[in-house]
């Protein structure tokens, strides 16, 4: 399982998570566990289930960029110059990136391509996207279905307060990257504050809250996640 993650341990930093491959992580966290009396295997799987939010957003931004480049830009240009091969490659890239974006927004790891469409059909919020992808694959109203797929992704971006844009997917990608930068910076500040807080010596002894990082981090996130980068960087 750890080999599937690309490490001999569970990634424990944003930098390590950045180099994990979602298809491998999908293999690691799916499937039935028939026996794990020690709980070791289950514990590792649970820790691999959710990646840091800034990494999720950066991976999402990458797929949104691909959607814009392949579906909203390359495909119509290829059709305009009567280049069916280039159009085919653009559509293939668009379908893959839109389905991967749907998985990321659903907090799921996208599986390998042979299972990607079936997995997308099972995502609760992306019925319209799955239908649009099928229609594109069958050559039906391609331009219209590209925009239907984009609209489905944009709707969930708005629901998760990642982007409110109705523009090209590249604009949504920029919004996702900006949000990732805010979260990464906030998490660095929270970690530094906790380190200082942990070392405080009180006259009456160590306070209970000094051993409760979970509550401490939630309180700080509720504050810092609402700030813009310039304000965070001024701390």
Model-assigned labels for residue ranges:
Residues 72, 99-107:
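Acidic catalytic cores of enzymes that act on phosphate-bearing nucleotides/polynucleotides
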Residues 86-88, 232:
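Solenoid-repeat scaffolds in large eukaryotic assemblies
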Residues 135-181:
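Long, low-complexity C-terminal extensions of enzymes
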Residues 112-130, 166-180, 212:
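Charge-rich, acidic-biased intrinsically disordered regions
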Residues 1-80:
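Conserved NTP/Mg2+-binding pocket subregion across the NTase superfamily
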Residues 181-235:
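Short amphipathic alpha-helical interaction elements located at domain edges
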């Amino acid at each position: 399982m750890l080999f599937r993650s690309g490490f001999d341990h569970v990634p424990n930093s944003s930098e390590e998570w950045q180099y994990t491959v979602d298809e491998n992580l999908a293999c690691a966290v799916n499937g039935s566990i028939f026996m794990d009396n020690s709980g070791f295997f289950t514990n590792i799987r649970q820790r691999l289930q959710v990646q840091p939010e800034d990494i999720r957003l950066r991976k999402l931004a990458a797929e949104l960029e691909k959607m814009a480049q392949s579906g909203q830009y390359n495909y119509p240009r290829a059709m305009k110059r009567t280049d069916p091969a280039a159009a085919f490659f653009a559509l293939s890239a668009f379908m893959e990136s839109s389905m991967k974006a749907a998985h990321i927004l659903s907090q799921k790891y996208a599986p390998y391509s042979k299972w990607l469409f079936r997995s997308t059909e099972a995502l609760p919020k992306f019925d319209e996207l799955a239908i649009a992808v099928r229609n594109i694959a069958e050559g039906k109203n391609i331009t219209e279905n590209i925009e239907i797929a984009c609209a489905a992704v944009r709707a969930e971006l708005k629901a998760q307060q990642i982007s409110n844009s109705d523009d090209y997917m590249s604009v949504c990608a920029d919004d996702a990257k900006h949000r990732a930068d805010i979260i990464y910076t906030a998490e660095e500040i929270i970690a530094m504050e906790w380190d200082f807080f942990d070392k405080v010596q009180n006259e009456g002894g160590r306070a209970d809250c000094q051993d409760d990082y979970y509550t401490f981090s939630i309180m700080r996130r509720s504050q810092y996640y609402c700030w813009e980068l310039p304000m965070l960087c001024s701390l």
